[in-house]
């Protein structure tokens, strides 16, 4: 199953990222002229190929959210709603899309829901990676799976269009997961890579007939450790209103090498704020910070406090003598006096007064 994924790029960044994969990307005008493929007789004329809405990067895309897909017929990026609604739907508001945000590979030729999209409306869903939860008893632990090289990731998808509502929707195809990921989940999205046999076949608009055996052989997921990676992330991804970049950061220290430089910069910034007197002790009550961010800031503040106390102790040892003599008291008074408040005259008076008591106190000590 794939119920959450991340797309860490704005709409303006995506065309170049596809070109980096040597994929052609048409402009809205070019795509519009090619939108009527010979096999799409039932499609509506003048279909929009690029949403008018500007897509912003989101690190927690869930069903019913909009995201980017790449259409092979128009060779354009289009933003559609996640959770496929078939073209024959009479009332979109009553259609339960939670049942259709994934399509099982082995059922594509067995279900009326999937047969037509599989024949004529195939696509690739763009993402930075997807989330999966490992369940042990009542405990669910989220993991993030992405490309090891950090490049844009593609998974096999299908789309449909409801004309009366002018609504494009898509689904993500999943299959039996590879042995290497069975411990995490039994199913996995069908990952595609441009330039491979599976990509070319799935994105071939001239191919409209499939057998289940052919589809399974073509799209069955495998886990190539040299290309894919996974690591544990914060539980905050479970809440759909959380969408920040921190959701895809490794939670465990051994997984965090790729983020170490950024973390050091963030901690240095906190230390600088601490030195300048900016009060960061309110982290605990800051509802905008959760999970790992709170932990990191608390750790930074704790370290700052310890370093500050240690520094003060060292300064005391080097600048203030041990207690006992009158001269010690003089130096302590000099160190503690504020010239702006007391004035230089009062300071000199105190120093002289304490200095005059030195001999008498010294005699008492000798007498004892």
Curated annotation (Swiss-Prot):
GO CC list: chromosome; cytoplasm; nucleus
Coiled-coil annotated spans: none
Active site positions: 2, 132
UniProt feature, compositional bias: Basic and acidic residues: 37-46, 281-296, 304-313, 326-349
Stretches for region Disordered: 25-48, 270-368
Main location: nucleus
Post-translational modification Phosphoserine, affected residues: 338
InterPro entries on file: SRAP, SRAP-like
Regulation: Formation and reversal of DNA-protein cross-link depends on DNA context. Catalyzes formation of the thiazolidine linkage in presence of abasic sites in single-stranded DNA. Mediates the reversal of the thiazolidine cross-link in presence of double stranded DNA.
Positions where Thiazolidine linkage to a ring-opened DNA abasic site occurs in the chain: 2
Subcellular location: Chromosome
Keyword set includes DNA repair: no
This enzyme's EC code(s): 4.-.-.-, 3.4.-.-
Example GO molecular function: lyase activity
Superkingdom classification of source: Eukaryota
Annotated GO biological process: protein-DNA covalent cross-linking repair; proteolysis
Keywords: Chromosome, Covalent protein-DNA linkage, DNA damage, DNA-binding, Hydrolase, Lyase, Phosphoprotein, Protease
PANTHER family recorded: ABASIC SITE PROCESSING PROTEIN HMCES, DC12-RELATED
Function: Sensor of abasic sites in single-stranded DNA (ssDNA) required to preserve genome integrity by promoting error-free repair of abasic sites. Recognizes and binds abasic sites in ssDNA at replication forks and chemically modifies the lesion by forming a covalent cross-link with DNA: forms a stable thiazolidine linkage between a ring-opened abasic site and the alpha-amino and sulfhydryl substituents of its N-terminal catalytic cysteine residue.
Domain notes: The N-terminal catalytic Cys-2 residue forms a thiazolidine linkage to a ring-opened DNA abasic site. Glu-132 catalyzes reversal of the thiazolidine linkage; self-reversal is favoured by duplex DNA formation.
Family: Belongs to the SOS response-associated peptidase family.
Protein name per UniProt: Abasic site processing protein YMR114C
Organism name: Saccharomyces cerevisiae (strain ATCC 204508 / S288c) (Baker's yeast)
């Amino acid at each position: 199953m794939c119920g959450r994924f991340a797309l860490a790029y704005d709409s303006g960044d995506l065309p170049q990222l596809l070109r980096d994969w040597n994929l052609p990307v048409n402009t809205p005008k070019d795509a519009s002229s090619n939108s009527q493929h010979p096999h799409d007789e039932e499609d509506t004329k003048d279909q929009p190929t690029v949403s008018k809405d500007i897509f912003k990067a989101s690190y927690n895309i869930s069903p019913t959210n909009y995201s980017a897909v790449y259409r092979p017929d128009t060779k354009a990026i289009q933003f559609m709603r996640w959770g496929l609604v078939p073209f024959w739907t009479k009332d979109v508001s009553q259609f339960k899309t939670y049942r259709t945000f994934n399509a099982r590979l082995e059922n594509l030729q067995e279900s009326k829901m999937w047969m037509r999209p599989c024949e004529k409306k195939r696509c690739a869903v763009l993402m930075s990676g997807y989330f999966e939860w490992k369940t042990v008893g009542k405990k669910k632990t989220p993991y993030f799976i992405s490309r090891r090289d950090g490049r844009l990731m593609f998974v096999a998808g299908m789309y449909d269009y409801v004309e009366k509502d002018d609504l494009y929707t898509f689904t993500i195809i999943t299959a039996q997961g590879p042995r290497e990921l069975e411990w995490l989940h039994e199913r996995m999205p069908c990952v595609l890579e441009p330039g491979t046999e599976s990509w070319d076949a799935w994105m071939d608009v001239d191919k409209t007939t499939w057998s289940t055996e052919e589809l399974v052989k073509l799209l069955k997921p495998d886990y190539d450790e040299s290309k894919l990676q996974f690591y544990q992330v914060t539980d905050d991804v479970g809440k759909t209103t959380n969408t920040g970049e921190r959701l895809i950061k490794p939670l465990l220290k051994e997984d965090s090498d790729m983020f170490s430089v950024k973390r050091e910069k963030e901690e240095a910034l906190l230390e600088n704020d601490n030195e300048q007197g900016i009060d960061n002790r309110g982290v605990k009550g800051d509802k905008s910070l959760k999970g790992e961010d709170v932990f990191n800031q608390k750790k930074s503040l704790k370290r700052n406090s310890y370093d500050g106390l240690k520094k003060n102790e060292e300064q005391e040892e080097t600048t203030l003598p041990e207690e006992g003599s009158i001269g010690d008291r003089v130096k302590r008074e000099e160190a503690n006096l504020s010239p702006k408040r007391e004035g230089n005259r009062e300071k000199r008076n105190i120093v002289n007064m304490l200095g005059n008591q030195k001999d008498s106190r010294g005699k008492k000590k000798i007498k004892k």
